[in-house]
């Protein structure tokens, strides 16, 4: 389970993993109040990518990344629905 040290590396790898097979990828966010750590995990059951942080500024990056993935998911779904109706 590779744990990334920089956000840029993690976000690129996670997006590639999602684009490879969108139906199998899951995203898990976990916050531990005791440690003050936020962990984001992206997995497709074969590859598991992990990024941990205790910095408040990284929360905004994670939020932006999460919304970017949601946009990709919606774009794929709307394309599939249009193709099915034709």
Curated annotation (Swiss-Prot):
Any idea which GO molecular function terms this record carries? Answer: 7S RNA binding
Taxonomic superkingdom: Eukaryota
The cross-references to Gene3D superfamilies, in alphabetical order and at most eight, read: Signal recognition particle alu RNA binding heterodimer, srp9/1
Q: Give the keywords, sorted.
A: Cytoplasm, Ribonucleoprotein, RNA-binding, Signal recognition particle
Q: Describe the function of this protein.
A: Component of the signal recognition particle (SRP) complex, a ribonucleoprotein complex that mediates the cotranslational targeting of secretory and membrane proteins to the endoplasmic reticulum (ER). SRP9 together with SRP14 and the Alu portion of the SRP RNA, constitutes the elongation arrest domain of SRP. The complex of SRP9 and SRP14 is required for SRP RNA binding.
What is known about its subunit structure? Heterodimer with SRP14; binds RNA as heterodimer. Component of a signal recognition particle complex that consists of a 7SL RNA molecule of 300 nucleotides and six protein subunits: SRP72, SRP68, SRP54, SRP19, SRP14 and SRP9.
Matching PANTHER family, A to Z? SIGNAL RECOGNITION PARTICLE 9 KDA PROTEIN
Q: What is this protein called?
A: Signal recognition particle 9 kDa protein
The protein's organism comes out as Mus musculus
Q: Write the lineage as a comma-separated list.
A: Eukaryota, Metazoa, Chordata, Craniata, Vertebrata
């Amino acid at each position: 389970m590779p744990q990334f040290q920089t956000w840029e590396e993690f976000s690129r790898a996670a997006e590639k993993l999602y684009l490879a097979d969108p139906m199998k990828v899951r995203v898990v966010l976990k916050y531990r109040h005791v440690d003050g750590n936020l962990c984001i995990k992206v997995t497709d059951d074969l590859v598991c990518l992990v990024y941990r942080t205790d910095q408040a500024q990284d929360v905004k990056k994670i939020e932006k990344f999460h919304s970017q993935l949601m946009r990709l998911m919606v774009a794929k779904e709307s394309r599939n629905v249009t193709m099915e109706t034709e």
